[in-house]
Amino acid sequence: MKSPLAQILQNLHTPARQRLLESQFKKVQTQNVSLEKTLKDKERELDRLKNELNNLEAKIQELNGTDILTKLPNRFVFKEHLSESLKRAIRVGYSLSILLIDIDNLNEINLKYGFELGDTVIIEVAKIVKASVREIDLPARWGGEELVVVLHETDAEGASHVAKRILKNINNLDITDLKDNSAIKVSATIAISSCPQHSSDVSHLIEITSQALLSAKEAGGNQVITAKC
């Protein structure tokens, strides 16, 4: 037994039938466009919620003062610590140095092997940095592929010895991609600045260290560099 719609279509002349089919087709097209728009709106809303969640996690991380990945103090804690330490160094009259450590090939590792392995590299480098400094010093996660260290009672020459030791251990890291058992080569660039040799201001000290780091990376990276006075 034919459906009512099929019966109507059979009884219609060809032009009328064609118009009806076109009308139904346009209606379906309109519905599809509406569904696609709704889907895109939902995707945008999902992206917005993800961004809000990431921002919230960053705020929580900042308030806690600890970097989730490395378990080191975060940038917020580092800057507060550096500010207070500089005041004390100036008042007491001792040297203080900072190291800015950038993992040279982290972006390449992320693209080639995935972000999970990239996170492993960051964690292992953080372990090396922490193991290479004293209890009185402060290693921290600056963000992305960068770590920082406050070295108390240490001038630029002493900081250079620490930095070279850290770099050597980073170069000797034994990390393997489990998918194809290939060895992952890790390198880093480390910049040094000191108070009072280079500056006694937090922002200026960080700025000149960043500039030195950039110069070293442009020269090929995988080296230790001291900021210019």
Task: Please report, for each region that a protein language model flagged, where it lies by residue.
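Non-catalytic regulatory/interaction regions at protein termini and inter-domain linkers
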Residues: 1-12
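Signal-transducing coiled-coil linker helices
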Residues: 24, 28-69, 76-87, 137-140, ...
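Nucleotide second-messenger and two-component phosphorelay signaling modules
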Residues: 59, 64, 84-97, 101, ...
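Conserved nucleotide-binding and Mg2+-coordinating catalytic segments in signaling enzymes
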Residues: 61-80, 101-114, 123
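Heptad-repeat coiled-coil signal-transmission/dimerization helices
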Residues: 78, 82, 122, 126-129, ...
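A short glycine-centered flexible hinge/capping loop motif at secondary-structure junctions
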Residues: 110-118, 143-144, 220-221
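GGDEF/GGEEF active-site signature
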Residues: 124-197, 226
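Catalytic-core segments of nucleotide cyclases and related cyclic-nucleotide turnover enzymes
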Residues: 160, 164, 193-229
